[in-house]
Swiss-Prot record:
GO cellular component assignments: extracellular region
Enzyme Commission numbers on file: 3.1.-.-
Residues of the signal peptide: 1-26
Stored SUPFAM superfamilies: His-Me finger endonucleases
Any one biological process term the GO annotation gives: DNA catabolic process
Compartment annotation: Secreted
Gene name, Swiss-Prot/TrEMBL: bsn
Organism: Bacillus subtilis (strain 168)
Membrane-traversing stretches: none
GO molecular-function terms, A-Z: DNA nuclease activity
Name the UniProt record assigns to this protein: Extracellular ribonuclease
InterPro entries referenced in this protein's UniProt entry, alphabetically: Endonuclease-I, His-Me_finger_sf
Main location (coarse class): secreted
Its biological purpose: Mg(2+)-activated ribonuclease which hydrolyzes RNA apparently nonspecifically into oligonucleotides with 5'-terminal phosphate.
């Protein structure tokens, strides 16, 4: 028998018996969708480090941020402001449906994930009663007194679903470390003038505030929003605490949930991006 004659039957036997199946299986595993990876990861966070295959980039961000690379300080801040300004603005009522998509539970499409508690709650329970979720302004809307009209008050890059009672407890506090644990939201702490969110969203909070401080510079009829290193800012257009936010940006890296949310906002709703999700290192370049 020739070598070719006995080799082909042997390959067939190996395929049938499953000896070559692992290679095919491994190849198939790399085709999992982002939703599959999010749903299968702990708490749906889906860190890139925990994925067997890295997530493909969403958009051509090199083109989007053209002109920003290599800049630092005020030059970088002003360039990013120009890039992300002029976005499509939603009404406050339109925010409800947007959040139902941007913050959808990857394990249950009928629910949203609440920011401070990580609870999955029905999309239909949006409102103002106990047991409902409502629209949390991460940059407190009293800090600059911009309310809920189109603009910073409806910018979904910093609006997130939150339990009504937890949202009320946070109020308009600045962000800082320490305080007493809030019983209705374990892992969150508060004192007289500050709120500390749970560890898994500390970076999310920081990057949302970085975005707001770059997007709203007072040149388009909206307040000039700025970070500072204080708490108790009240109605001034400032939010703190800058040094703590920079620490949180490093402690809680960007995850796939943030990336997916950023992409949905860019593609479907506002058509602008949060630069600090795409390039978290830029925060230290602007606020050294």
């Amino acid at each position: 028998m020739t070598k070719k004659a006995w080799f082909l039957p042997l390959v067939c036997v190996l395929l049938i018996s499953g000896w070559l199946a692992p290679a095919a299986s491994a190849s198939a595993q790399t085709t999992l969708s982002l939703n599959d990876r999010l749903a299968s990861s702990p708490s749906g966070t889906g860190s890139l480090l925990s994925l067997a295959a890295p997530a493909a980039p969403y958009a051509d961000t090199d083109t989007y941020y053209e002109g920003a690379e290599g800049k630092t300080g005020d030059s970088l801040k002003s360039t990013l402001h120009r890039i992300i300004s002029g976005h499509t603005m939603l009404s406050y009522s339109e925010v409800w449906n947007a959040l139902k998509e941007t913050d959808e539970d990857p394990r249950n499409p009928n629910n949203v994930i609440l920011l401070y508690t990580n609870e999955s709650r029905s999309k239909n329970l949006n409102g103002g009663n106990v047991g409902d979720w409502n629209r949390e302004h991460v940059w407190a809307k009293s800090h600059g007194d911009f309310g809920t009209s189109k603009g910073p008050g409806t910018d979904i890059h910093h609006l997130r679903p939150a339990d009504v009672q937890v949202n009320s407890a946070r109020g308009n506090m600045d962000f800082d470390n320490g305080g007493t644990e809030y019983a209705k939201a374990p892992g969150n702490y508060y004192d007289g003038d500050s709120w500390e969110p749970r560890d898994d969203v500390k970076g999310d909070v920081a990057r949302m505030l970085f975005y707001m401080a770059v997007r709203y510079e007072g040149d388009d009829g909206y307040p000039d929003l700025e970070l500072n290193d204080k708490t108790g800012n009240g109605s001034a257009p400032y939010h703190g605490k800058q040094s703590v936010l920079l620490e949180w940006n490093k402690q809680d890296p960007v995850d796939d949930r943030e990336r997916k949310r950023n992409e949905i906002i860019y593609e479907k709703y506002q058509h602008n991006r949060n630069p600090f999700i795409d390039h978290p290192e830029w925060a230290d370049e602007i606020w050294p």
